[in-house]
């Protein structure tokens, strides 16, 4: 658990890459039923197979050297009640993925959530603490509607504020439209993960994403 996510291990010919540390236990988890306590949240370590083969009990595991200059890792969360119910196509999320990929990021996860603070906070914590991604971009839920809870949920899980990015985005938006001042998006840090709220409009996403995926900014959160 002291090793970072993306650490790689060899067991004979098999190569594994750590993908997540800790995982929420389900109420009916078999381990919990058998032992009365689940180890998943505090001891669970998960990996994906990079090179397959056969392993046996007692095989020695070797920690492999880290990659040289690995890509930064990102996750994208779309907040939309209608989108989460399949009633509206998510156009902003795929656009963000496209822009991140073009900028050299490895997008580990994408998801669509309803505008629910509890669900958003849980995913932000999991992605930052368990998956240890460098960057989480949210899109949607930054306006004045009572259901727009993205900034509040983001601040609730933050360790530190990083206001300059959100301020730069609002400044840039104001140069295009006076409505730019209506965005309540925030930018914060949880551990080593940067979390940035983007508006839900694909047009605004395209205009604003360039600010924080530029080289000077992105290299600051390695």
What kind of feature is each model-predicted range?
Residues 69-115:
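Glycine-rich phosphate/diphosphate-binding loop of Rossmann-like nucleotide-binding domains
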Residues 12-14, 71-74, 131-133, 178, ...:
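Short coil/turn connectors at secondary-structure junctions
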Residues 212-222:
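Single conserved hydrophobic/aromatic residue that forms the stacking wall/gate
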Residues 77-78, 138-139, 197-199:
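Short beta-strand segments
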Residues 208-210:
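Active-site-proximal C-terminal subdomain of hydrolase catalytic domains
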């Amino acid at each position: 658990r002291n090793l970072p996510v993306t650490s790689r291990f060899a067991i004979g010919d098999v190569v594994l890459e750590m993908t997540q540390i800790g995982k929420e236990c389900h109420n009916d988890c078999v381990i919990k039923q058998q032992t009365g306590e689940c180890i998943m949240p505090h001891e669970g370590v998960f990996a994906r197979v990079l090179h397959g083969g056969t392993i046996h009990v007692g095989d020695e595991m070797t920690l492999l050297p880290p990659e040289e200059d690995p890509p930064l890792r990102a996750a994208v969360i779309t907040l939309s009640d209608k989108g989460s119910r399949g009633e509206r196509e998510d156009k902003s999320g795929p656009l963000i993925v496209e822009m991140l990929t073009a900028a050299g990021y490895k997008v580990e996860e994408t998801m669509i959530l309803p505008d629910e603070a509890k669900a958003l906070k849980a995913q932000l914590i999991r992605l930052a603490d368990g998956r240890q991604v460098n960057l989480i971009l949210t899109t949607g839920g930054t306006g004045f509607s009572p259901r727009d809870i993205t900034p509040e949920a983001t601040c609730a899980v933050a360790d530190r504020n990083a206001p300059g990015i959100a301020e730069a985005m609002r400044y840039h938006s104001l140069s295009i439209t006076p409505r730019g001042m209506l965005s309540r998006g925030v930018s914060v840090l949880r551990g080593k993960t940067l979390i940035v709220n983007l508006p839900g409009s694909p047009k605004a996403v395209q205009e604003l994403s360039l600010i924080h995926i530029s080289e000077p900014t992105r290299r600051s959160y390695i």
